[in-house]
Design a protein with these regions (language model features):
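Rossmann-fold NAD(P)-binding glycine/threonine-rich loop
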Residues: 46-97
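Single conserved hydrophobic/aromatic residue that forms the stacking wall/gate
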Residues: 2-9, 13, 295-299
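A structured beta-alpha segment of the ubiquitous adenosine-cofactor-binding alpha/beta core
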Residues: 14-48
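Short alpha-helices
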Residues: 90-124
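Conserved acidic residues
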Residues: 34, 59, 101
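A short, aliphatic-rich alpha-helical micro-motif
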Residues: 6, 29-31, 55
């Protein structure tokens, strides 16, 4: 099975798949698998064409790529946050002419901590603006310390395209279905700064947030504690029992200590306090290579 992949890993591939070409043997591959995880290193127009080819072959596609994230009838899902967007698949299938095949995508890994943290506060307290500075692990670039020695004892203050994705994608996630498309939300206003740091796995975000109806600190903590979603209701194998976890210690969360919480499927939050310019600020952490992609495909 010939795929361009960014990260080199030792993995076992079935013998019957090793002689197949992912671009040329679509029909054959589609007949052999239940669905496709797509994480390829190709041009965006080529990725869009390839993913639609598999979907039209009646093979569901769960994509880690950004190519289809803003296709209006392709759901970009964080399962605890916007599972209702899966309903747009019916419209997508009409466009593609499929009965079973479809495409669903995961969001950019930079926002997988702060979007869930803001989600239970959105409707009741109405988030008006947010600032997030992310400190992103090298695995997000498909790197290890061996392949990326320049990151040692260093911080790189630029990740190409990351800030644009981090500001735009949450608005689709918080959007709504209207007819045959997903319409982006118009609020909150989001600004971001994304840095690459010498950490193997786990993206950390320092978040500042303001509300139309400012909650108390206790109300925020209770909202995080009570928050759960469809993965928890369905008791999916990978679903964390507690999705949002607040640490009272001043030095938490830490990537090294907390990224694997609940098998890497939970979000860790800490240091909630009032801010002089925004209403509140806090720090949150998620495992960038594990969270979300797995249980999008589980139901």
């Amino acid at each position: 099975l010939h795929l361009s992949i960014r990260r080199q890993r030792q993995m076992c591939i079935r013998d019957r798949l090793t002689v197949l070409n992912a671009e040329e043997d679509v029909e054959k591959i589609a007949s052999m698998v239940d669905f496709v995880f797509c994480a390829v290193d190709m041009k965006k127009d080529e990725i869009r064409a390839l993913e639609e080819k598999y979907a039209k072959a009646e093979c569901p596609v769960v994509s880690n790529n950004s190519a289809h994230r803003h296709t209006p009838d392709v759901p970009m899902v964080i399962p605890e946050v916007n599972p209702e967007h899966i309903e747009i698949i019916a419209s997508q299938r009409k466009r593609l002419g499929t009965k079973r095949g479809f495409i669903a995508v995961k969001s950019n890994c930079s926002l997988q901590s702060y979007v869930p943290a803001l989600a239970p506060l959105m409707d009741k307290y109405k988030v008006t603006k947010a600032l997030a500075c992310t400190y992103q692990a090298i695995s997000g670039a498909g790197k290890t310390f061996e392949s990326f020695p320049e990151i040692l004892d260093n911080v790189i203050p630029y990740i190409g395209g990351e800030e644009e994705k981090s500001e735009k994608e949450p608005l689709k996630i918080w959007g709504h279905i209207e007819g045959d498309v997903i319409v982006d939300a118009t609020a909150p206003a989001i600004t971001t700064q994304c840095l690459r740091v010498p950490v193997s796995d786990g993206h950390t975000a320092a978040v500042f947030v303001s509300f139309e109806n400012k909650p108390s600190k206790e109300e925020i903590l209770q909202a995080w504690k009570d928050f759960s979603g469809v993965p928890q209701e369905l008791q999916l194998p990978s679903a964390p029992k507690q999705f949002l976890n607040y640490f009272t210690e001043d030095d938490r969360p830490q990537a090294k200590l907390d990224r694997n919480l609940e098998g890497g499927m939970a979000v860790s939050i800490g240091r909630l306090r009032e801010d002089s310019q925004y209403d509140y600020k806090f720090v949150c952490l998620s495992h960038n290579t594990l969270l979300s992609l797995i249980h999008i495909s589980e139901p």
